[in-house]
Amino acid sequence: MFGRILSSLTILVFALVVGAELAIADDYRPAPGIPDRYGILYDTPIYDPVSKSYFALIWAHKTVYRGTDWQTANAEAMSREYKGIRGRLAVVDSLEIHEFLERTFHPNVDAWIGLRYWCQKRMLEWSNGRIAKRSFQAWDLNWQQDVYACKSGDKNTDFMPVAYTPTDKGFRWIGKGRHKEYFAYFVEFPTGHP
């Protein structure tokens, strides 16, 4: 009897804690089009005339303590639509796009982009399927920051996703393990026009 009561209380406390985390995460969720308390604009597509794409920094908090892994961010980006165009994790293949993202969104958290390193093949691939050229790169000096990157055990499907560091840490690319979670990601809508 006592064991059942204790078990029920444990479940109730767990549910309250998880519910509180979700409520707190939602309380801090900024409204689209309105900068948050740090001046960061989330969930609002902004047009870049150089690339002819819209970009948005997406709020990706699952709870206060949980973010979104790269694969989930990739799927969520592809499920988004703006002006009739499907989204994708952002392809940052030029200095102009890099500077646009930094200047426009200046994130204070790490944020996924549409780049991954295929470990077995030793190649970088963008979310649009193109192989990354060496023409533009924004790697941090300490770019591989995860001892678990490229060590999932499945050599054929193992990859290291790439994210931006916050602007106060240089706004540079870093590689992480597949299961790392971040609180934001960049989505791109390649409309070709405003």
Task: Outline where the language-model segments fall.
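Bacterial N-terminal signal peptides
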Residues: S8-G19
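Positively charged n-region of N-terminal signal peptides that target proteins for export
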Residues: M1-I5
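Polar helix-capping/helix-linker motif
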Residues: S7-S8, S94
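Extracellular, disulfide-bonded carbohydrate-recognition/adhesion ectodomains
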Residues: L22-P194
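Intrinsically disordered, low-complexity segments enriched in Ser/Pro/Gly/Ala and basic residues
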Residues: L6-S7, K151
